[in-house]
Amino acid sequence: MQDIRQETLNECTRAEQSASVVLWEIDLTEVGGERYFFCNEQNEKGEPVTWQGRQYQPYPIQGSGFELNGKGTSTRPTLTVSNLYGMVTGMAEDMQSLVGGTVVRRKVYARFLDAVNFVNGNSYADPEQEVISRWRIEQCSELSAVSASFVLSTPTETDGAVFPGRIMLANTCTWTYRGDECGYSGPAVADEYDQPTSDITKDKCSKCLSGCKFRNNVGNFGGFLSINKLSQ
């Protein structure tokens, strides 16, 4: 369970957000390997992206299917990485196709990256502004001379736990406004700051329980209100 920092939530609602950077940690220590840190891009200095003092080496890597799902079976994302010089082939042969390894996905707004990434530094650098999700490598679905693809599963699927397979937030709804999980399809009510409006172009959800109350839709709130009580 992770609380998303308020500064990151504020960045989500800005009209002009900074770029979202996805950082990947592939931890193969449980299957006899090492930890690898990759990013699909470089910083503005043409160097590896640095986050929390750690460098993430530029390497072709792409994830898909990480959208939140509140219905049916758990999400099964796919991670595709370059098989440059046969690196993945060698590891897959030595470590049972990497099954059982851990994949950590970090999303960070460029606004909060370490100052060392920028020519003129960064006064907004904040190592706590990240959103993390953890996954297990369930199977190697494709392996060629060009790339390798892996199907991921949530740790709860492999350890027998029964928590929902998504980030659990107490006061923030993670559903897409007016999407299937949200279920609201009525007229315009309020903007993202819960200010009343009848303009459909300004109608946005605040992602808070108050937004659901405005729309008489509390039953579909996508947060976990009881989590706050667990630490009391």
UniProtKB/Swiss-Prot annotation:
GO terms for molecular function: 4 iron, 4 sulfur cluster binding; metal ion binding. InterPro entries: Phage_lambda_L. [4Fe-4S] cluster binds at C173, C182, C205, C212. It is found in: Virion; Host cytoplasm. Binds 1 [4Fe-4S] cluster. Belongs to the lambda-like tail tip protein L family. Part of the distal tail tip complex which plays a role in DNA ejection during entry, and in tail assembly initiation during exit. The tail tip complex is assembled successively with three tail tip proteins J, one tail tip protein I, one tail tip protein L and one tail tip protein K. The tail tip complex interacts with tail measure protein to initiate tail tube assembly. The formation of the tail tip complex is completed by the addition of tail tip protein M, which is followed by tail tube polymerization. This is Tail tip protein L. It comes from Escherichia phage lambda (Bacteriophage lambda). The lineage of its organism: Viruses, Duplodnaviria, Heunggongvirae, Uroviricota, Caudoviricetes. The gene is L.
